Every structure is written in C-alpha cells, then in structure tokens.
C-alpha cells in the first residue's frame, strides 16, 4: 500500500511539473485563438492585433527587435467578411459554415465545378450558389489583382429543398486593396554571430461573418507558442548561437509573409546554421514529421534529430520527407538549411474549422518534442 501511494504521488508530482512546463505555451495558444483575435486575418485587423500581442511578448521577454517595433511590414490585396451574414432559401435561414460557406475566388466557380454541381443559380449581382455533397475546406482570401471574381456560395445538398423558389443572400464582403500586414521579428544575441532561426506563422483563416470564428489553435497558434517558448528559454541566459525568431502573417494565403521575408532579408543567410519552422505542434501521438529532411544540406540535421530520438524515445515515429511548398520554411530553403517540423496524430481540435480550439490542443508530448528541437539547436536547459 505504501509503495502504491508513493507511486501515485510520483505520478501526480511529475504530471504537475509537466503541466507547469507547458503553462506558458497553453496561455499563448489560448490568447492567440481567442475571439479577440478575430481568427488572425484581415477582418477587424485580427492579424495586426495578434502581431501587436506577439511583439509585446517579445519585448517583455527581453528579445531584441530585428526591425523597428519588431515589425516587418508588407501588403497584399485581400477580402474580409465582417458583420452578420445571412442566406435564406424559401424563407428558411441556413446555418453558416455547417450548411454553407462563402468563397469570393474564381476557383470555386470554375466551369468544371459548375458543371459538376447538383444545383446552381447565379444571382443578379453575379454571385454563384452551387449545391455540393461536401463543403470545401475553408481558407482566407487573397488576390493579386483587383477584384474580378464572382462570389461563390457552396451549399450542402442536404440543406437544399427539392424546389428552390426564392433565395435571399446578404453577404457583406469587403475588398481590401494593399492591406497592411506584418511579420514579427526579434533576436537574442549569442556568443557568436552564427544564427539559428526559428519560424512559425501566426495568421489563420479569420472569420466568416461575426458568428463564425476560426480560432486556429493547432494551426498555428501552437507553433507560434513553441517559438515564443524557445525565445523565453534562450532569453534567460546568453546562448552560444545567436537566436532569431520570425513569426509570419500570410501563410494561409500562399506563404506570403515568409516569401517577403526571404526576398527582403533581415539577416545574412550565409551566417544561418539552420532554420527550423514549426507548424501545427499539438497532439503528436504518432510522432514527428520533418520536411526537407533529405537534401544534402539538411540530412545531417535529420540524422542528428534521429539520434536524439533514439536516446530519448520521445517520438513514436520520426518521418523524413522531401521539400515541399507546404509551410514557411520553403522560401528560405533556397538560401540556407531549412526544415519544417510538425506533429503527427491526435489530440487536436480540428483543421481550418471552428473546432480548432485551445481546449482541443493536446500538449502531452510538447515538452519532449521541444527538448529534441532545443538539443538540435545546441540549446541546453
């Protein structure tokens, strides 16, 4: 009985330590995925609210600004959808997101897609309504030219009556020309000026009207929180390598923030030992995946990570993948060794949907996985 009590106490004690270790990360995820951030895209300038929050946190930690006020500004053309949205068919109000989704881009109203639609109707203002068996994954809206595309509203076939007599749509989309957004950038000077760069995107999908929020906790408040946690750790004592932290906007609409940062560099890429991008870092029951792990420049780092894992047994699997334009490491891989690490498996709330909440983010593997990354970067705790 005494041994059992000691064992239970030890389990409870280490669980408490684990919870304490991830408390900072949990708070960052909670703050970034809150309704006050408006999904961290253009609607109500949610991305700017998030950027100001992250810059303030860097300053509080003692991370130095890589640019004035920690901001690297750039622009793009985009849409936002603020206010109440409404779609009534035959007098019946449909439920936004679950029964219909709004897309103001041409790819959702292509001739091919219109031909495949089980039902379609074009309103007087050019808006297309199409019936589909499954709604597309939601993404934010960015365009490279002035708005010319019709709005497309996808409606679940199960939400459509047998005969559509009347459609009333109130979808107040706003087009924003040269919308100002920003990357958040800082650094902690090391003993040497050789750099390790940690990156993540802090943006997400915004809102689809005032009643549909995309919190983006797993994607990618979690990766942003991990980068901030590394900043917190290295700011407590001078690291050997100079540590650079770049948090990007515009990832969800085509890796725009990281592309701008790569093409308008704030650091000398010749001095970058490794760039490590972290995207979707909750869950992880199935291990870790590493993109761009097989190139001549990056394979030694993957082998090092594999050796670390063989000692710690932290990750059930460690899967190498070739390079891919699927996250913010991609543009930098032309200039310096760059990898992208993400978790595999549950638990997390959802993907590009309202269920991707802080409450759904599992951090049970977080400490072990972070230690692997810290060891890879030569950071001792």
Language model region names:
Residues 1-22:
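Bacterial Sec-dependent N-terminal signal peptides
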Residues 21-49, 61, 65-66, 86-87, ...:
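N-terminal capping segment at the start of a domain
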Residues 35-45, 73-75, 172-174, 210-220, ...:
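Second-shell loop/turn segments in exported
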Residues 38-128:
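Noncatalytic luminal/extracellular "stalk/propeptide" segments of secretory-pathway proteins
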Residues 93-94, 103-109, 135-216, 232, ...:
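Soluble metallo-hydrolase cores and metallopeptidase-like ectodomains found primarily
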Residues 231-256:
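Short helix-loop-beta-strand segments that form the rim/entrance of peptidase-like active sites
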Residues 232, 349-381:
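His/Asp/Glu-rich mid-to-C-terminal helical/loop segments that flank catalytic regions of hydrolases
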Residues 248-347:
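Metal-dependent peptidase/peptidase-like ectodomains
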